[in-house]
Amino acid sequence: MSDAGLVIDTHVWLWLEAEPDRLGEPARARIEQAARAGKLWVSVMSVWEIGMLVAKDRIRLSMPVDEWVRQASATPGMQMLGVIPEIALESTRLPDAPHGDPVDRLLMASARLHNLTLVTADEKILAYAQQGHLKALKA
């Protein structure tokens, strides 16, 4: 595992909290290892994305979104990763980026700038990582 740790995609965070069996065993093991080391990151953009998905009635949580975020982000070893100007700019400069989705671009930029491995099931991001643009792990 990278010394810098892991950043998890929004859907991975949702799965981790509600459907952990959807995660492959290698991803689950790496997430647990990163959490024990205090190197498990969730982007604040994932908080925003979950809030938007709830507001648009595209997902339902088992509790109000504010409470869900509070509880889910209290996972031992998990830290919130903010969006700093360098990440925002990097997201506009991703070489051959596979996504126009702003949250995915910000997650990829965060992983690149902080030398993190992005845990995702997004096939476009995984293929992008295989091209050497960032480190990724299949969820």
Question: What function would you assign to each model-found segment?
Answer:
Residues 37-40, 58, 77-79, 113-117:
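Short active-site oxyanion
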Residues 69-96:
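Acidic catalytic patch
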Residues 97-103:
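Donor nucleotide-sugar recognition loop
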